[in-house]
Amino acid sequence: MSSLKEQLAQVAASNATVALDRKRRQKLHSASLIYNPKTAATQDYDFIFDNATSALEELVEIDVRFKVFSRSLFSASSVNIDRNTQTKEQVRTLDQAVNAYLMLASAWWHLTPTLHATEWLVRRFQIHVHNAEMLLLSTLNYYQSPVFKRILNIVKLPPLFSSLANFAKAESVPSNLTIVKLFNDMDFLTLYTSYVGKVVKQKVTYTNQLLFNSCAFINLVAFNSNSEEKLERLVPILLEVCAKLLASPSDDCQMAAHTVLVVLVTALPLKKQILLAATETILANLADSASTKRCAFVTVCKLFQTLKGHGNVDQLPANIYTLFDSKISNDCLIDFLSKKETPADKFVTSYVRSIARYDHGKLNSIVSILKQVKLEKFEVRLIITDLIHLSELLEDKSQLIQLFEFFISIDEDMVLRCLHSLNLTGELFEIRLTTSLFSAERIEPVNGEDVVKGLEASKVAGLAGGAQPFTEFLNKNSAYICTKNISLLVEDDEQASKLLSLFVESVGKKYQPGLFLSSFFTTLESRITFLLRIIVSPGAPVALRLISVSNLSKLIHTIGNDTNVFTLVPVLIVALTDISKNVRAAVKKVLHQISKRPFTKRYFLNDKIYGEGQSVPMLNPKESESWLKTFLDGYLVENYDISQLLIPKKNEKMYLLFWANQALYMPLPQPKLVLMRFLARHESFSSTYSQLWENFLSSYLEQRPQWELKCSKNKTNFCEFESVLVLLLSKKEKNPAAIEFLLGALKSPFEQLASIMAKRLIEIYPTLKQPVQCQIVQDIIESTASADLSYDSIETLQSLALSADVVVSVIKQNMINVDETSNIIKKRRRRSSASNKAALQKEEVSRIAEIHLRKLTILLEALDKIKVQGSEALLTSLFDILADLDTLDNDGGLPVLYAQETLASCMLHTIDSLRATGATPKLRSVRTDILVAAIRASSSPQVQNKLLLVISALALLNPELVLHSIMPIFTFMGAHSLRQDDEFSTMVVEKTVKTVVPALLESGSSSMTDEIEFLLMSFSTAFSHVPKHRRVRLFTTLIKTLQPSSSIAPFLFLLSQQFSAKVENFEIAESKSILEFSRSFMSKFAVLDQLTGIAGLFELVKLLSEPDLKDKTSPRTLLSNGILNYTPSEMFNYKRNTFDFMDKILAEDNQGGNKGENNLKLKLLSALLDPQTEEQVKSDVKDQFAKVLQHNLVFINNVEELCSTQDLTEQGKSDGDESGSEPDNDNPVADMTEILFSLLGHILDLLPISTFVESILPLLGKDTEDIIRKHLTLVIGTKFESEPNSSATYANMTASSLLAIVTDEAEAPGVVQAALNTTSTLVSKFGDRLDASTLTECLKIGVQKLNSSSTDIVVSALAVLTNTVHVLGVKSIGFYAKIVPRALAIFDSVQDTKSDLRKEVQLSVVLLFAAMMKRIPSFLQSNLKDVMRAIFFADEVQNSISLYVISLLVQQLDLKEVLKTLYRIWTTDISKTGNSVAVSLFLTTLESTVEAIDKKSATSQSPTFFKLLLAMFEYRSVSTFDNNTISRIEASVHQIANIYVLKLNDKIFRPLFALTVRWAFDGESVSNLQITKVERLTAFFKFFNKLQESLKSIITSYFTYLLEPTNALLNDFHSGAVSDTNLRRLTLTALTASFKYDRDEYWKSTARFELLAESLVNQLANIEDSIGKYLVKAIAALASNNAGVDEHSKLLHRALVEHMKASCATSQKLWAVKATKLIYAKVGEHWLVLLPQLVPVIAELLEDDDEEVEQEVRTGLVKVVETVLGEPFDRYLT
């Protein structure tokens, strides 16, 4: 019986959708999957139904199974169905229909129609309440999609889904971990697996759902992987759901089950019975698709891999084996295993053992299965043991031969161990299987008789073979009895194999061998040859071979002595190679037996032994007797190699011929193989003997299939047979038939033979004659080019030891331009002809051309790989090939790029090998024009690069050969190769330059200079196309190869033209790139080369200035690029840009690009100062530097002439010059001069300081032009800036010279200014390292120049004084009186002017004072006010500098004096100015001073500070700034005041505060009579409010000083005498803060309270609406402060009630209500006693005519009172 709780839950669930009130019904109806509740609440069922039916129709089109619901859930009658009025049966039917719909719809929740259709079920049938479980289960796999969020938002979550409750209204979606924890609940898992079973049964599963199920179950297993107990609880549930999935015909369902099973058994290995049951279930309903079968097989394998312990690889149960065999075919099994997707050894072992037990017909397939999997040793042992047992039962034991051969090949020892464990030996088992299995060293019986005696029928025949009379055996096999007098050596292999097996069987049944032989072979000849065949048969067991030897001996005794049995010896000699020592010993005995017989002329079976009518040439009896005795004397049984004994040295040729015939006529493959091996390995075997084999070799390719079959049936290794066969092709082979066999074998379709022959060819090729070699190579090339061969002909060809002569011969056979190559004098390249093109367009000719190209390619690849020693003929032939390729490319359009590249490699190697030999060939027939043409015509950069390397190599081998092609080569390189951005192309260009250019230089040609300049032009033209990161290395290589001394200048000249063009076209990035390159480029050369190049560039620019230039220099190549055609303006721009280019090259790169060890300046210093540098080098460097300097000065002196081309501008215009006819600068002379002086400075800067000073000081004399002296002076400053302090001596010398210039009254102002600036730099740089007299002189001259009429000179003088004062400090005090007043006067003189130098003057004066502050601060106090005024009013100086000077002032000077000075300067200057910068700096200084001043000083200066403070409070009345600016200033002042007050104690601060109050209220100490009382009060209350925020309760008692004045002020506000809203707000804020921060019951004093309370409340009468809230807060704060004093509360309450009467104004009542509401909200409990007096007032206010008042009371005051009371207020009103 269910519990009461459960009964109540059922009742609640059934009534979940019963709504008894309107709100409940509306809430139920507004639950929607699509619409928000407000929209859903307005919709009727008809609208929802129409949408749903339309959506259902769309779903029906997708899945027709939805149609059934159109007659139930979506029928027209469903609109009127109310599940609350249905019977239980009807409700159950309805739930079943809903559940069926949800299971079907589960697959389509990602579609909009599903939402709209399900919306009907939610709205009409409330499935989110009654079918919530199924709704959630069917959509759970959408847990991270928006649709699931919608469902969670409306569904009533069942208890099992409670973990999803947190996501119902949240923004986030359930995580993967949430789902795992949900499934970890066993009750939920049971529920979900039940649902899975239902969907599988209903056949409504789909891929995403199954994927979710699999992932959920897998994650669940992983989540509990550490808890074996939990996993064991999961096993039955998961196995049940897997069984349901496997029962489905769906591929997806089965795959899902496979996945889950694999993970489950991996986490928790299961019992074998469970795994077998699972396997049976997997196989029972296995789908036919290949993917499902593969998945099932992998699963089964993984299941079996988890088995542990004894019996884990037992045979499969019969029903499972049968089931597996019916579902998965053998081919599928092998295919699955070959993919090796999973370990399968355990299953395969069980499966193979099952085959051995149940299905003997499939034994033949076991090997193919085992080859695909690697088994453990114990698994192999079990299978072998099973098969050995099976051999006892199996009638046809031949099925096991292949199996045991496989096992023996992988582990022979294990097979023998298994046999021994079953009391079997290897030889007996061989007899049982009627074949040879084991190697002889493993099984060694004593002799044949012992074997026969030891045989037991049961061990040989097995349990299947019982005792059988011989007659019965004979009758059964009578068909195989041989009655003819024939040789069994040539008998059909099938017949012989059967007789062999019968012989083995008879021996195994213990029949006497003689009985078998006499019964089955009626003639002696057939018996003997049968035994011979067994003795040399690899398929016969060793024991049987021993028995055969024994019986052969007996039969020989029966042959008469008149018969010579030497015919048997060759076969017995083969038997001596048997791997069994016992067999060899037995055979030796037989040979001894034969040697003792008479050697007559009648040979036994001489014409029949190798075939009927085959008469084999034999040795004469005497020779045969002698040979056999000699052989037996030398033979030892232990000796396996008998080749030396076989063919003795004496009569070697005769014996070689004899054995060659024996090998030729031998019909059996194994003996033939042995004899051929003996022959081929003999040192005397040659092509002479191979002639015997002509017929055999000629027919072998046709008969090869028969030989392969024969080897297979006789168990002879066919690969070994053919390997020995090809050995018949001897070294130095010349037999045409043998060569034809070789070529035929290579072209044959037999891969094995072709590969073996290829290896043999590689071995014998070097010994062949050249014609044969050529024939073979040509044949290989032709066959490779025309057909697909079965061996790697390319590798074979590349492995041959080709010689240059062979290659040349083959090349000649493969040429198409033979007529042209024969004429070696021709130097013109062959031109393409229309006839050639037309011919090559024909299909047949085109095909031949393609084959020809393939031939050339094959040959070139081989040549490239082999690296043949080069010769002139070979190199000539290679150039002929290049011509052929040119023809095929141009005329035939064939792809020759690869061939050309390979050819280039061959050429390179050939040339290198010629150079290595030291040969100097004339190479007259080598046509470099073809090479150059190929380079130009090729579209491949790789080919071009390779061919350029060929040219480089040729230049090294024979320089004259390439000289006439230099120009085309470098033209091409400039247009193509330089543009390639790869390391190889760069290397090629560099190598070409390094090899070809020296050839040009060494040639001594008269036109060499022109060619070099042409080369430079070619390369420089391509400059912009060369990748940036490769330029420096490339062009450095070029110039170094061309000799830097003569080529840097032309190259820079060409580069400067490009730079100028980029600048004129505003291509800034490109011009910078050229500059960066030039700096790096120049740094790669020695200092002398750099200076020579710069001087040369000056000379070339000078050359352009000569008159009649065009006519004069027209022959020069360097000027042939159009520069002579420049218009005058273009020429001017070029020169200007070139000088700028030079200047920037020499300038130090600020970013460090030119400051490394390769810097020209450093190199110059090293050359001049390094003691190891030779004097000649120093002299040369100085000479070149002098040239550079001289050129620069010449251009400066002739700058007017240099710019005179501007006069021709108009002429240029008239001649049609439309491009850039005007220079960029309006003053070209000044522009050019500036650049030249900058260049001069950088040139001089290169010198070491000592040389620099010696060189430059003489130039400062009067004889030098002023402008040059000015620039030189500036250069001095720049030079010394980068010098170390150790150069102070030179600086002192320079400073003295400069001061001498300054003192000269006749000097030009510009020179004087420059001298002062440079002197300032020197003083700043070297400081006290300069002589004291020099520094004193600086002060004197600086003071003197302060009186100059030139402001520029004054500024420079101030700079000198600043730096000198900074250095001398107190020592400069003697000049203080002369400096400061004059500096202040200078400052004042520019303040009211618009001078261009106003900023510079202000900055100079400020910096002078800063220096004095640092060095002589105490002396500066006498002029502190003026100094500070100068700082404040220096509005042109940057803020950062001013702030720095102010920080110095605060740090260095006495702060008391500073504070006094600030007060004075405020009153006299700052308060009267409109300069915002001055005010800002003043406030900054004041703040810094206040922050830095100590408390003692602050106390002593407090009167001064407060005077300043009051003066600043009055600033508002006199300032011209806007209100916002003044407010910001006041805010800063308040902040500063707060900081200062914190440094004072109460004793000091109180009187000052009282003074401030009196100033505010009474006007005491007012300095500005224009300020009004309201302004004073406003300023005061702002200050007081900030003070209260900072000090809080500390200054609450200070309110005493302003209590009565404030009360009077409040009364004035009430009466209207004062009506300033802002002041009123500030006053109320001050009162609120004071009430709020009162911690000492200051305001609980009755006197103070009564004085202020009424005045404060009276403000309600006329408070402005904008500040009413401040009044409410003040009243509430006062009430809160006095909450514990009942009398005060009553007084305040009565006052408030007075303002809420009906007679009061609306605003007055409203604010009074708000004040009362806030009071009750804060201290309601204390005011509850006053509530009775308030109730009538509230009742009256609730009936107030003003709606706003009524609403405020009803919704505000009443609600607050109810909150305090804890009960409705209505009962107080009744």
UniProtKB/Swiss-Prot annotation:
Q: Which domain of life is it from?
A: Eukaryota
Start and end residues of each stretch annotated as Disordered: 1209-1228
Q: Which UniProt keywords apply?
A: Nucleus, Repeat, Ribonucleoprotein, Ribosome biogenesis, rRNA processing
Q: Mind telling me which SMART domains this protein's record contains?
A: BP28CT
Which Pfam family, an example, fits this chain? U3snoRNP10
Each HEAT repeat, start to end: 1734-1772
Q: Does the keyword DNA-binding apply?
A: no
UniProt xrefs under SUPFAM superfamilies: ARM repeat
Gene Ontology MF terms in the entry: snoRNA binding; U3 snoRNA binding
Look up the record and give one Gene Ontology term from the biological process aspect.
Answer: endonucleolytic cleavage in ITS1 to separate SSU-rRNA from 5.8S rRNA and LSU-rRNA from tricistronic rRNA transcript (SSU-rRNA, 5.8S rRNA, LSU-rRNA)
One cellular component (GO) term of this entry: small-subunit processome
Localization, UniProt:
Nucleus, Nucleolus
PANTHER family, alphabetized: BAP28, HEAT REPEAT-CONTAINING PROTEIN 1
The function of this protein is: Involved in nucleolar processing of pre-18S ribosomal RNA. Involved in ribosome biosynthesis.
The record's note on quaternary structure and interaction partners says:
Component of the ribosomal small subunit (SSU) processome.
Please give the family membership noted in the entry: Belongs to the HEATR1/UTP10 family.
Q: What is this protein called?
A: U3 small nucleolar RNA-associated protein 10
| Organism of derivation | Eremothecium gossypii (strain ATCC 10895 / CBS 109.51 / FGSC 9923 / NRRL Y-1056)
